């Protein structure tokens, strides 16, 4: 089953690029940050601290992260990923310097591998 999933994800790559391009044209994607969806980043982490990664897709999920953010941000690089522009805006407006925000990469093996190679999180937490 896992091999089928990987095959399908590779097969969908051209369509994912096309969808991202359409979203850019419609202004539904941040033109300065869309490459984050493919695992790239220009963001910097404090190399003295390990990374804790919290993923919250939407604003509603992100709002439930307050205790986690306040618990981890002083000790760790706190990487927050979201999938929507609204959640990204909310995260940066409300937590700014406490967090590092990046859009979550699309669920395609090479893009996730690139993301994980860059950030090397010690802990990953998904909010559902």
Tell me what each language-model feature is.
Residues 2-24:
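Short hydrophobic helices that act as membrane-entry/anchoring signals
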Residues 17-39, 43-128:
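Active-site and donor-binding regions of nucleotide-sugar-utilizing enzymes
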